[in-house]
Amino acid sequence: AIAYPMALPFISMLIPRGPGNPMEQPKDAQGTGTESGIQPQYGVPYGVTLNPFLSPFGLPCKQPAWGYISALDLKTNDVVWKKRIGTPQDSMPFPMPIPVPFNMGMPMLGGPISTAGNVLFIAATADNYLRAYNMSNGEKLWQGRLPAGGHATPMSYEVNG
């Protein structure tokens, strides 16, 4: 099995219903919210805020690494391999170009997809890369730059499928 554990603390707070936090979804509402901030959870007595635990400078209050990609053996419960994934290249809280991306291990929003060819694709980090890994050993096979962060599970097609 493939997992992408995150080691970044988040702060969640229950928010009672009231102005700005209605019980029912407004008729003109678009979408369901964002990854952070207030999560409406319509139909229940409380909403919830979800935000990373950050310093006043906007940086996490825990040292890196924050994100990994790993393979698990479901029969033995062993971690087969575990690699840091993601760079801070496109996710600094203020404009700071980092010319040489270094693999720090960043939080992810999105998931991987695996193929019959034993290749795992993932674009869930905020550093605007799509990456391919060998599922057997975790070796990075390829990475390509995206115009923006993927934050989603890639899609795969089969020729003549």
Predicted regions and their residues:
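Beta-sheet-rich non-transmembrane sensory/scaffold domains
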Residues: 1-161
